Curated annotation (Swiss-Prot):
It comes from the Bacteria. It holds the Pfam family AAA_2. Belongs to the ClpX chaperone family. HslU subfamily. It is found in: Cytoplasm. ATP binds at V29, G71, V72, G73, K74, T75, E76, D261, E328, R400. Its main location: cytoplasm. Keywords: ATP-binding, Chaperone, Cytoplasm, Nucleotide-binding, Stress response. One of its GO terms (cellular component) is HslUV protease complex. InterPro entries: AAA+_ATPase, ATP-dep_Clp_protease_ClpX, ATPase_AAA_core, Clp_ATPase_C, HslU, MCM_dom, P-loop_NTPase. ATPase subunit of a proteasome-like degradation complex; this subunit has chaperone activity. The binding of ATP and its subsequent hydrolysis by HslU are essential for unfolding of protein substrates subsequently hydrolyzed by HslV. HslU recognizes the N-terminal part of its protein substrates and unfolds these before they are guided to HslV for hydrolysis. It comes from Rickettsia africae (strain ESF-5). GO terms for molecular function: ATP binding; ATP hydrolysis activity; DNA binding; peptidase activity; proteasome-activating activity. GO terms for biological process: protein unfolding; proteolysis involved in protein catabolic process. This is ATP-dependent protease ATPase subunit HslU. The gene is hslU.
Length: 450
């Protein structure tokens, strides 16, 4: 059944689990068990916030381990969940990390990056609230440059109206703006600090704070360009930076979602090659343990507790098994969800049902050239059939196979669309067969093309 956007009755605790699943159904086909698991995890966060007393701090999120091959919806479920709740969301591959003491990224950088995302989110929200005031101040600064600070109110009002109407957009003015040139070099990490605990330090930031951040320079630019630069400057002055940082840390601690992909790649197996590599992978797992269980990570914004951050780990587990992870790490990912491989029916639904389905995307793209692109039901079935065939014969990459097939299928149309204005193109099963049958039947070629 096709999911549609629904207006829900206001709930003081936010969306209910069934409502969350309905929202995910708008974009993701199947995988009901995984959707149900993340919906419960999200609702439990809301429930925890309403628990009173010391018990609230004892209730920790039940972290999730998603098991399934690539392209079945693991990442998309987590990404849509974060977007649905406006939570800080950070996705990272487990293979990017090395254990503490080795060259490479340490796992604490996950929390530093999550907090950075939360700060940017809060800052953007705060700027929207002061946008009107900031715009007024920007106009006043431009008026000072245009007519001088001592000009009459009547003159200023006249020129202000012209600025608002866009009549002076292309007029060049000379105006003082903040000097954003980096001071004193770039960023570095302090060696010898446990896990580089303060994160990346920027010399420019440090020197700027020491000398004061009021350094400006005079530049010549058009009025419209000046507005684009000055409005953010004025917004920065109007917002309370300390308050934003406090809110961002609170948001990251209580609503943050961390998605760790390819966790199966750091699992140690008996046949996993060099002993040192296995030790290194195990080291990364051990470094992840305190982070997932709950610890305090020092960031440039202050200490951040990870006790109530929701961790979702995922992996295909083709070679390694979940039981190959360290027992302690398995215990910190108590909810296990297996995602099913996609069937032909799933592929058909993926092409048609989501609000942002691939068919709708390609039709919209070609439609910008005044060309109407339509897909017959027989074509959709044929595309799904080919996607399943190649996944079985070459390698199973799930729904991502549809992207490759559609690109090859519509290559000529995409190339020639600008010369086909006003035309209607119908894609049927014969068209699909003519375009793709040679590639599909030649598996050696399909490995490279599809």
């Amino acid at each position: 059944m096709k999911a549609t956007k629904t207006t829900y009755k206001k709930d003081p605790m936010g969306l209910t689990p069934s409502q969350i699943v309905n929202e995910l159904n708008r974009f993701i086909v199947g995988q009901e068990k995984a959707k149900k698991a993340v919906a419960i995890a999200l609702r439990n966060r809301c429930r925890r916030k309403r628990v009173e007393g010391n018990l609230r701090n004892e209730i920790v999120p039940k972290n999730i381990l998603m098991i399934g091959s690539t392209g079945v919806g693991k990442t998309e479920i987590a990404r849509r969940l974060a977007k649905l709740t406006n939570s800080p969301f950070y996705k990272i591959e487990a293979t990017k990390f090395t254990e503490v003491g080795y060259v490479g990224r340490d796992v604490e950088s996950i929390i530093r990056d999550l907090v950075e995302i939360a700060v940017n989110t809060e800052k953007t929200l705060a700027k929207t609230k002061v946008d009107i005031h900031a715009r007024e101040k920007a106009i006043e600064r431009i008026l000072d440059s245009l007519v001088g600070k001592t000009s009459s109110s009547e003159t200023r009002e006249k020129f202000k109206e012209k600025i608002l109407n866009g009549e002076l957009d292309d007029k060049e003015i000379e105006i003082s703006v903040a000097d954003t040139t980096p001071v004193g070099g770039g960023s570095f990490e302090i060696p010898g600090m446990p896990g580089a605990s303060m994160g990346v330090l920027n010399l420019g930031d440090m020197i700027g704070r020491a000398l004061g951040s009021s350094k400006t320079k005079t530049k010549k630019m058009l009025v419209k360009d000046a507005m684009a630069i000055i409005i953010p400057e004025e917004s920065e002055k109007l917002i309370d930076q300390e308050k934003i940082i406090q809110q961002a840390i609170n948001l990251a601690e209580n609503d943050g979602i961390v998605f760790i992909d390819e966790i199966d790649k750091i699992a140690s197996t008996g046949s996993s090659g060099a002993k040192n590599a296995a030790i290194s992978r195990e080291g990364v797992q051990r470094d992840l343990l305190p982070l997932i269980e709950g610890t305090t990570v020092n960031t440039k914004y202050g200490p951040v507790k990870t006790d109530h951050i929701l961790f979702i780990a995922s992996g295909a587990f083709h070679i390694a098994k979940p039981s190959d992870l360290l027992p302690e790490l398995q215990g910190r990912l108590p909810i296990r969800v297996e995602l099913n491989s996609l069937t032909k029916d799933d592929m058909i639904k993926i092409l048609l049902e989501p609000e942002t389905s691939l068919i709708k995307q390609y039709s919209a793209l070609i439609g910008t050239e005044d060309v109407r692109l339509e897909f017959a039901a027989s074509a959709i079935e044929k595309i799904a059939d080919y996607a399943i065939t190649v996944n079985l014969e070459v390698e199973d990459i799930g729904a991502r196979r549809l992207h490759t097939i559609l690109e090859n299928l519509l290559e000529d149309i995409s190339f020639e669309a600008s010369e086909m204005k006003g035309k209607k193109i119908t894609i049927d099963d014969k068209f699909v067969e003519n375009q793709l049958s040679k590639i599909i039947t030649n598996l050696d070629l399909a490995k490279f093309v599809l």
